[in-house]
Design a protein with these regions (language model features):
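PAS-family sensory/regulatory domains
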Residues: 36-47
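Conserved hydrophobic beta-strand signature of PAS-family and PAS-like sensory domains
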Residues: 15-18
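PAS-family sensory domains
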Residues: 11, 71-77, 90
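PAS/PAS-like sensory domain cap-loop motif
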Residues: 24-35
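PAS and PAS-like sensory/regulatory domains
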Residues: 4, 66-68, 75, 80-84
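Short loop/turn elements at sensory-signaling interfaces that couple input to output
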Residues: 84-108
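Short hydrophobic secondary-structure edge segments in sensory/regulatory modules of signaling proteins
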Residues: 6-8
Length: 109
């Protein structure tokens, strides 16, 4: 029962969503069953800062954590500012996932 939105993706280049909590649903309007198997790109749109996404991608490819914020979009198409922190977590010997903790913000940092 987290206040923050939690999204877990596989650590492959595709980064498919394997888990989302109820706070993700409240934040974005997307149901958990709607997003599992998709990528977080479903939240991106025309005003999403591509430079932030490039920094995110570079950090993840290097196995590093990332913190950032950007304009994302709810299921209904309304834009909002999302702040997020993504960390790599090893769950088995050779298996890693990315855990993203997200919350709505008032300004892009």
């Amino acid at each position: 029962n987290s206040f923050d939105s939690v999204l877990i993706t596989d650590a492959t280049k595709a980064g498919k969503i394997i888990y989302a909590n109820k706070a993700f649903n409240r934040l974005t309007g997307f149901g958990v069953k709607e997003v599992v198997g998709k990528t977080p790109r479903i939240l991106q749109g025309p005003a999403t800062d591509k430079k932030v996404l490039e920094r995110l991608s570079k950090a993840l490819q290097g196995g590093k954590r990332f913190e950032g914020s950007a304009i994302n979009y709810r299921k209904n198409g309304n834009p909002f500012i999302m702040h997020w922190r993504v960390v790599p977590v090893k769950v088995e010997k050779n298996t890693k996932v990315w855990i993203a903790i997200q919350r709505e913000g008032t300004a892009v940092e």
